[in-house]
UniProtKB/Swiss-Prot annotation:
Transmembrane segments: none annotated. The N-terminal domain probably binds unfolded/aggregated proteins; the C-terminal domain interacts with ClpC. This is Adapter protein MecA. Disulfide bonds: none annotated. It comes from Staphylococcus epidermidis (strain ATCC 35984 / DSM 28319 / BCRC 17069 / CCUG 31568 / BM 3577 / RP62A). InterPro entries: MecA_C_sf (IPR038471), Neg-reg_MecA (IPR008681).
């Protein structure tokens, strides 16, 4: 478990699922067994207190983010002086309630993550019989996503493509220093035109198995709506 002290009232921790299991708990215990869930989070708080002298007192605010390999939890103590009037029993009861809410939120995140991983698994399976990535053309889809390795590739595409931007809505995402360009075509656009647009994109970018669900959850939206026009507005052509 990795613990980060943000400030006097806030700590952040990340614990992998393998670490959770090494402590004698399973994911099923946490999501479905209230008592085991409370036991696990209290043990985490004891460990945080030992390492960071972070004593649980008064109201707490807990945020959780579920990822593929583990869970990130942010815990903040109230700065309100009224918290000093709370008894230990009140504090423990309040913390238990928030732990239960935390587990419910994380369970929802787990379910959506499982759906996401299943989608990505299915996508990879569908691509196994393709001879070349760049030879692949979308079939009967109205949304395509490609990956740019760096900003220069994005700028190059913005200045040298000849696609009609009135025919689609687009978004530019960034995650892990990579750029992902998502285009959703109007119903009036034929599949042949979509395939042609995809081929043009692959002259500057690369295919990707990232989905809109994944990008919306984990990536940052850099630009939206006529992305190429915005890129040309803020950047000069690197090939000039």
């Amino acid at each position: 478990m990795r613990i980060e002290r943000v400030d006097d009232t806030t700590v952040k921790l990340f614990i992998t699922y393998s670490d959770i299991e090494a402590r004698g708990f399973s994911r099923e215990d946490l999501w479905s067994n209230r008592k085991r869930g409370e036991e696990f989070f209290w043990s985490m708080m004891d460990e945080i207190n030992e390492e960071e002298d972070f004593v649980v007192e008064g109201p707490l605010w807990i945020q959780v983010h579920a990822f593929e390999k583990g869970v990130e939890v942010t815990i903040s103590k109230s700065k309100n002086e009224d918290a000093m009037n709370m008894s230990d029993d009140d504090t423990n009861h309040q913390f238990d309630d928030q732990v239960n809410e935390l587990l419910a939120q994380t369970l929802e995140g787990e379910e959506s993550l499982e759906d996401l991983f299943e989608q990505r698994k299915q996508q990879k399976k569908n691509h196994q019989d393709k001879q070349q990535r760049r030879a692949h053309k979308p079939s009967n889809v109205r949304n395509i996503i490609v990956k740019f390795d760096d900003l220069e590739q994005v700028i190059d595409y913005a200045y040298h493509n000849n696609q009609n931007t009135d025919e689609f809505e687009d978004l530019l995402y960034m995650i892990d220093n990579k750029y992902y360009y998502s285009i959703h075509f109007d119903d009036s656009v034929s599949q042949e035109m979509i395939n042609d647009s995809y081929s043009q994109l692959l002259e500057f970018a690369y295919p990707t198995d990232k989905t809109n669900i994944y990008l919306n959850d984990y990536a940052k939206i850099i630009m939206s709506h006529n992305v190429t026009s915005q890129v040309r507005k803020y950047f000069t052509d690197t090939n000039e």
